[in-house]
């Protein structure tokens, strides 16, 4: 019996030590950590980071584009695209979801409603009164869809870039994410190797586009948010409480609203398979489909 107890204690130490090392120095995000540009919007669940970009006066068209990022990578994924929208005369609003980037990490269940209501709260806080153009990348796609269903009069158009919601869920793959304690241990211990593995696989040098992020720069920017408490909780809670695999019913409903829609998808997407375009076009048949041959899941920053 004594040997069993000693053995269990050794196993506990082996598991606890790397977890302690990885989590002990995590910081609480504060306003002093924010970039010089942008700020916090005080919402019901906490402070949400946002930043505005404005076109030159002579190009301004008085239209607002809101860029909604995906599961784990915050607003920097839009850096290479902003210039094109500004040149076209749009004002741009970017933000970080709760639990990501420079937004606070409330200890809550990260459900669909949290993301939809935070988008609504942000627009209200910024006194955006006119309908906006929503652009959703990956997880941002379902968020844009759900928001449009709930607030159709607030949306001018939708653009869906490699939208989540058309993936086949495999219960034998990454099952540990859904398990309490197990998921927390794995993600805290192995960090970016697990969190950003899908993006890393798709982010391969060399890059011909001067606006593209190198793998090194991507990991540096994406990993910055991991030094703050609550990031891993936000990812795990989102995976457990927001269905990112099957959003067909929602997209079918939003298709009935007949909002102008653009869908952009890469044929070699290893995260949200390109075959999802067939089902999306069934639900939103009026959508314009832009196919990027050999494009992968990192198409917003590659």
Q: Where are the model-predicted features located?
A:
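Alpha/beta-hydrolase fold catalytic core
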Residues: 1-63, 87-90, 248
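Conserved alpha/beta-hydrolase catalytic His-Asp/Glu region
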Residues: 29, 189-255
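Active-site loop/oxyanion-hole signature of alpha/beta-hydrolase fold enzymes
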Residues: 43-45, 51-57, 87, 97-135, ...
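Conserved HGGG/HGGXW glycine-rich cap/lid loop of the alpha/beta-hydrolase fold
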Residues: 53-102
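Flexible "cap/lid" loop of the alpha/beta hydrolase fold
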Residues: 149, 156-189
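Short beta-strand/loop motif that positions the catalytic acidic residue
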Residues: 257, 263-265, 269
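Conserved alpha/beta-hydrolase "acid-adjacent" motif
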Residues: 270-276
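Catalytic histidine-centered segment of alpha/beta-hydrolase-like enzymes
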Residues: 271, 295-302
């Amino acid at each position: 019996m004594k040997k069993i107890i000693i053995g269990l204690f050794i196993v506990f130490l082996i598991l606890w030590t790397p977890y302690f090392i990885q989590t002990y120095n995590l910081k609480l995000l504060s306003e002093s950590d924010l970039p010089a540009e942008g700020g916090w919007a005080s919402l019901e669940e906490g402070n949400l980071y946002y930043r505005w970009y404005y076109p030159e006066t002579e190009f301004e068209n008085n239209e607002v584009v809101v860029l909604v990022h995906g599961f784990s990578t915050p607003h920097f994924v839009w850096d290479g695209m902003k210039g094109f929208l500004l040149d076209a005369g749009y004002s741009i609003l970017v933000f970080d979801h709760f639990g990501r980037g420079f937004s606070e990490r409330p200890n809550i269940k990260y459900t669909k409603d949290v993301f939809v209501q935070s988008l609504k709260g942000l627009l209200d806080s910024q006194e955006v009164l006119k309908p906006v153009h929503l652009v959703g990348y990956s997880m941002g796609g379902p968020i844009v869809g759900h928001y449009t269903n709930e607030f159709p009069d607030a949306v001018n158009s939708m653009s869906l870039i490699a939208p989540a919601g058309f993936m086949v869920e495999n219960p034998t793959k990454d099952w540990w994410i859904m398990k309490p304690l197990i998921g927390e241990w794995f993600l805290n211990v192995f960090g970016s190797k697990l969190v950003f593995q899908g993006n890393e696989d798709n982010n391969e040098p060399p890059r011909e586009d001067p606006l593209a992020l190198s793998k090194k720069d991507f990991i540096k920017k994406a990993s910055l948010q991991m030094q703050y408490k609550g990031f891993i909780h936000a990812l795990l809670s989102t995976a457990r409480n927001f269905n990112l695999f099957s959003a067909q019913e929602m997209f079918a409903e939003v298709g009935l609203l007949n909002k102008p829609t653009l869908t952009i998808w890469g044929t070699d997407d290893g995260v949200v398979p390109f075959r999802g375009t067939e089902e999306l076009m069934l639900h939103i048949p009026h959508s314009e489909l832009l196919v990027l041959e050999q494009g992968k899941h990192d198409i917003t920053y590659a």
